C-alpha cells in the first residue's frame, strides 16, 4: 500500500500548516476613539457651545462595518431643529439646559426617530446617547447607561 504513507505525509503537512498559522493569529485592535464632527457640518452652533448652567450631552454614532450603512450620514436633531449630521465613528457634544429635551436622528431613507432625553447634572446618570443601525439597516437611538 504505497498510498498510505503519502496520505500520512499530507496530513502531517496540513497539521503543521494549521499550527503555524494559529501562531500568527492577530489580537483584536484597541478601540479607536470617536472623532469630533467638524465645525463646518454644524448648522446650529448654539447647541454646541458651552455655557453656565448647561450640561454636556454626548451623542455618538457607533462604528459599523456594514457597507450599506457605513457611508450614510445620520442627521441629528435637538428639540426639532437639525443641528448636525454624524458619520461612522463620530460624536458631537451638545450643551443643554437641565430638563427634558427631544433628541432625534434620521437618514435620507428613514423617518426621524426621536426620544425624550432628560438632561441632568446628577452624576448618577449618564448624558450620552448612541446612534446605531438595526439588522434591516434602519436607524436607532438609545440612551447609554453608565
What residues fall within each predicted segment?
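Sec-dependent signal peptide recognition
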Residues: 7-14
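Short loop/turn and low-complexity linker motifs enriched in small/turn-promoting residues
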Residues: 2-5, 24-146
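C-terminal motif of bacterial Sec signal peptides marking the signal peptidase cleavage site
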Residues: 19-23
